[in-house]
Curated annotation (Swiss-Prot):
This is Copper resistance protein B. Residues 1-27 form the signal peptide. Residues 36-75 are annotated as: 5 X 8 AA tandem repeats of D-H-S-[QK]-M-Q-G-M. It is found in: Cell outer membrane. GO terms for biological process: intracellular copper ion homeostasis. It comes from the Bacteria. Keywords: Cell outer membrane, Copper, Membrane, Plasmid, Repeat, Signal. InterPro entries: Cu-R_B_prcur (IPR007939). Pfam families: CopB. Residues 44-71 are annotated as: Disordered. It comes from Pseudomonas syringae pv. tomato. Induction: By copper. Sequence repeats lie at residues 36-43, 44-51, 52-59, 60-67, 68-75.
Length: 328
């Protein structure tokens, strides 16, 4: 019996000891011609030395004698004992899928113009930012500062009005009508007309400027004016809301006026004409209605101060103010 045959039988015995082969396999091995099991000597595994695989030569199966695999019993090539394989997944849906139509494509790929929103809806807003009584040196003063708009998110018609009445007499009054166009979410370009009713005779100005929110929600306005006779002017305004609580708000304000030339009839001097700073503390009973108390400080400069002294007025004055702020 060749060494290869002996190795084959030993492997079968080892597998049998693990219960991995049926008895029929060994019956087939016993019936295999050319293999004399009686000649096989007991294998002393203690004599087996480490196998040097590097010395193993290629096996020539053509030299193997006496092994007739056709005589092996118990091995059925059909392998009926194996579990049947799972059926292949269907390649088509039970419910046929309808072909894509133009209507389907239109529903998915909409126009790039964006969703329809209320961009062009007309709205309005009216704010009485200052409607107050002032304790002035010359008596009681009624002061107002009103602005509002009507239009959409991009284009609006702005209305501004401010003035004061002292002891029932109108000292100053003006009205502005401006068309505003949004150039960013926070800033508008404005242009239009300004009409002065007092002081002096009425005067009409062309107006254009910029308004919006600066850093930290600081509201700012810069408006330039071109009046009759070549008169020019520039007004800078700003205010800021400081929330002490959700309803108690402190509001500092500032206004500066410049003019290109003197106008004695209206008490206006060239250059820096006048400034006004103030602070108002309001309590919002409702968001739309808030009474307030505050103080303002006015000062005239240059020729404007000289014209004020000629009228018997001081160049600077502090006033206590009481008023309400409301909007619609």
């Amino acid at each position: 019996m060749t060494v290869l045959n002996r190795l084959h039988v030993c492997s079968l015995l080892a597998v049998s000891s693990l219960g991995m082969l049926p008895v029929g396999v060994f019956a087939a091995e016993a019936a295999m011609p050319g293999v004399d099991h009686s000649q096989m000597q007991g294998m002393d595994h203690s004599k087996m030395q480490g196998m040097d695989h590097s010395q193993m030569q290629g096996m020539d199966h053509s030299k193997m004698q006496g092994m007739d695999h056709s005589q092996m019993q118990g091995m059925d090539s059909d392998m009926t004992t194996m579990a049947p394989s799972k059926p292949a997944a269907p390649t088509q849906s039970r419910t046929p899928i309808a072909p894509v139509t133009d209507a389907n494509r239109a529903a998915v790929y909409r126009s790039a113009k964006g969703h329809t929103v209320h961009d062009e809806a007309a709205n309005y807003f009216l704010l009485f930012d200052q409607l107050e009584w002032q304790d002035a040196d010359n008596g009681s003063v009624l002061n107002w500062d009103v602005n509002g708009w009507v239009g959409g998110d991009i284009d609006r018609l702005w209305i501004r009005s401010e003035g004061e009445r002292t002891n029932g007499k109108t000292e100053s009054a003006e009205l502005q009508a401006l068309w505003g166009h949004a150039i960013s979410p926070w800033w508008d370009l404005v242009g239009g007309v300004r009409q002065d009713f007092k002081p002096g005779s009425p005067q009409t100005w062309a107006a254009f400027g910029l308004q919006g929110l600066a850093l930290y929600n600081f509201e700012a306005e810069a408006t330039a004016f071109l009046g009759e006779g070549g008169q020019t002017g520039l007004r800078l305004e700003g205010d800021y809301d400081i929330l002490l609580t959700n309803r108690l708000i402190l509001q500092p304000t500032a206004e500066v006026n410049f003019y290109g030339q003197s106008d004695p009839q209206r008490g206006i001097g060239s250059g820096l004409s006048e400034t006004e700073v103030g602070v108002r503390l309001r309590y919002e009973i409702r968001r739309e209605f808030a009474p307030y108390i505050g103080v303002t400080w006015n000062r005239s400069y240059g020729n404007t101060a000289d014209f004020a002294r000629e009228e018997g007025e001081d160049r600077s004055e502090a006033r206590l103010v009481l008023g309400v702020r409301m909007w619609f």
